[in-house]
Amino acid sequence: HNDAELSRLVSRGLVTIDKDDLEEMIDAEGEVLLIRAHGEPPRTYDKAHTLGFEIIDCTCPVVLKLQESIRKAYEKHEEKGQGQIIIFGKIGHAEVLGLIGQTDGAAIVVENTLMLDEFIADGTIDLGVHTEVFSQTTKSPAEYAILCAGLEERMEGPLNIHDTICSQVATRHDRLSKFALEHDIIIFVAGKASSNGKVLCDLCKSLNIRTYHIDSTSEVKREWFR
C-alpha cells in the first residue's frame, strides 16, 4: 500500500496483474511472478507454475502460518465429513481470499457481530458442528474477542478459537491508545487502501478526534495545527 514504493517499482519495470490477467495468459516462460505480502490462494501458484513463471513468494510469514493452519483444519473436517471454518475478516480483502482458498472456497467469512447473527439466523453457520475460528492477521483484537464471545455463548458443537492476529498488530493497539491520548494531534501515515492502517488510524481517532490519515506530506494542512 506504499504508493511511493509502488511507483518506484513500476518505473523499474514492475507490472501489476490480478487473477483475471493470470487466467488469460498462455505462456510466461522466463518471467518472474512476485507474490505480495497478503498471500494468494493455491490456484494462483498452480496456474503460475503451469505458465512457467519463476515465483518469488513475498507472503508474510505470519500469513503463511495462518494459511497452513486453516488448510490443516479444513483437511481434518473433510476426513470426518463434517465441520466448518469461520474467518473473521474483511470480505474481498486479498489476505482473506488467500485464506478462503485453503478451504476450496468453503470457509465462512464474517465481518462483524451483525453478520454473525445473520449467518446464525439463516443457517449459514451451523451451531451443531465442529467449528474452527480464525482471524485475518490485521484485524482488531477487541472486535475478534467480541465475535468469539458471541459464538461461545451459542455454539452447541465443539468450538476451537485460534489466536491468529499478528502480535505486532495486537501490541500496537495498546501502544497507540496510550500515544493518542498523550498528544494533541496525530498524523497517521499509511496507505489509504491499507486495512491495517485504517484499523489503527480509527483506533487513534476514537481516542483523539484530531487524528489525520495521510500517505504523503502534500496532504498535511496548516489549519490542523491552529
Model regions and ranges:
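The feature marks the mature, well-folded catalytic cores of soluble enzymes
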Residues: 1-226
